[in-house]
Amino acid sequence: MIRFRPAAARELADDVAYYDRDYEGRGHRFSDAVDRTLGLIATLPEAYPLLYEPEIRSAKVARFPYRVVYVIVGGDIDVLAVAHARRRPGYWRRRR
């Protein structure tokens, strides 16, 4: 099961809205790319590199400068952030 922390869900919604507003049609493509990344994470959650202890991992979103940051908790995936790769690195660490 994949669960989004509330702040991560808000980030994703805000980023989709940004792409829809500023780049017509891109919000849908961004959302699809995040969904594909989540599918890959669900299939092989431990395949992605550790960023920080304990067990914080990150998977790149194809074609967009974003990463899905997550932890594995009891076999489930908790998404901590859908983070822009070049803005405010590590801002989501306090969400653990």
Feature-to-residue mapping (PLM):
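Residue-level detector of alpha-helical recognition elements and their boundaries
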Residues: 23, 27-30, 49, 56, ...
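Arg/Lys-rich, positively charged N-terminal/basic patches that mediate binding to nucleic acids
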Residues: 1-33
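Basic/aromatic recognition patch in beta-strand/loop cores that engages polyanionic ligands
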Residues: 43, 47-77
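Enriched for short, Lys/Arg-rich terminal
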Residues: 66-67, 71-96
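Short, charge-rich, low-complexity interaction segments located
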Residues: 23, 45-52, 87-90
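Short alpha-helical segments used as structural interaction elements across diverse proteins
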Residues: 2, 23, 54-57, 64, ...
